[in-house]
């Protein structure tokens, strides 16, 4: 089990980090009271959860007394954990609070800088126990995601972090609105005009064999699959955790369906989690 505790300065990006880990398949909890950490970890041990990330920070008030005793309890129970600590400069934190117009959890007199300095002092000890410290002062949300992916790449070894949805559709019924990329395969040979194939669909081998036997299909599939093999890792590096590819033909029953199925087979061989939806196959 991978158990990650995310903590650090308020406004330093803990919510961004938690969203990243959730997109990467972690079970995530925000603002977990420190006193519940060891009990929660124990529950996770007896579940099917294998990757857990929790945010526990100064919002828990009785932060240090509870947190350090909970970490000690984890160690006694033999539960491995890591601590990620996020910080940023006073100037950046003040600017972020002004931009969001949110109140610092320790700000009782309207002095944000005093609250930030107090929090920094209180967090000094837990910072010293952190496995990884990231200063987000000069990082955008996207850049923080890049850094997290780099730092925690070992958590995803052997797995593609991006999931892919492939939608086949018919242009006569409209293009899916949620597609990231749309491909038009109406140039491929059309089984609709073959009497024995007209009422069949691209899910059937006989239709697939017809489409695949043509050189234009074979050339297109090679180039298409090579392009997706190049593009998806690049989109993943830009922070996308899910990608939707729409493939259209005239009616959405033959060419687009076959192409979606063959693309799925290719992406599965590359380790991606793939879901296929044939939007118009029954129309």
Swiss-Prot record:
Gene3D superfamilies: P-loop containing nucleotide triphosphate hydrolases. Keywords: ATP-binding, GTP-binding, Nucleotide-binding. The keyword Nucleotidyltransferase does not apply. Pfam families: PapZ_C, RapZ-like_N. GTP binds at residues 57-60. ATP binds at residues 8-15. Coiled coil: none annotated. One of its GO terms (molecular function) is GTP binding. Signal peptide: none annotated. Displays ATPase and GTPase activities. NCBIfam families: PRK05416.1. Belongs to the RapZ-like family. PANTHER family: RNASE ADAPTER PROTEIN RAPZ (PTHR30448:SF0). This is Nucleotide-binding protein Hore_15880. It comes from Halothermothrix orenii (strain H 168 / OCM 544 / DSM 9562).
């Amino acid at each position: 089990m991978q158990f990650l505790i995310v903590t650090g300065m308020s406004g330093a990006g803990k919510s961004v980090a938690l969203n990243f880990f959730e997109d990467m398949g972690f079970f995530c909890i925000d603002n977990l009271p420190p006193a519940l950490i060891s009990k929660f970890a124990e529950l996770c041990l007896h579940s099917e959860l294998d990757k857990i990330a929790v945010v526990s920070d100064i919002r828990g008030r009785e932060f240090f007394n509870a947190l350090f005793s909970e970490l000690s309890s984890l160690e006694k129970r033999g539960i491995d954990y890591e601590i990620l600590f996020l910080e940023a400069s006073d100037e950046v934190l003040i600017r972020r609070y002004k931009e969001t117009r949110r109140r610092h959890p320790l700000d009782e007199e309207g002095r944000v800088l005093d609250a930030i300095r107090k929090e920094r002092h209180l967090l000094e000890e837990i910072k010293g126990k952190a496995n990884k410290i990231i200063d987000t002062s000069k990082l955008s949300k996207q850049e923080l995601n890049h850094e997290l992916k780099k730092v925690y790449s070992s958590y995803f070894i052997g797995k593609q972090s991006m999931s892919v949805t492939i939608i086949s559709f018919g242009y006569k019924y409209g293009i899916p609105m949620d597609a990231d990329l749309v491909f038009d395969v109406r140039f491929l040979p059309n089984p609709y005009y073959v009497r024995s194939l007209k009422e069949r669909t691209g899910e059937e081998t006989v239709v697939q064999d017809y489409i695949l036997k043509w050189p234009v299909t074979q050339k297109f599939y090679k180039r298409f699959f090579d392009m997706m093999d190049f593009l998806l890792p690049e989109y993943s590096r830009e922070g996308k955790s899910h990608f939707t590819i729409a493939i259209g033909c005239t009616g959405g029953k033959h060419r687009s369906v076959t192409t979606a199925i063959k693309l799925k087979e290719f992406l599965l061989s590359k380790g991606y989690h793939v879901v296929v939806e044939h939007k118009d196959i029954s129309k």
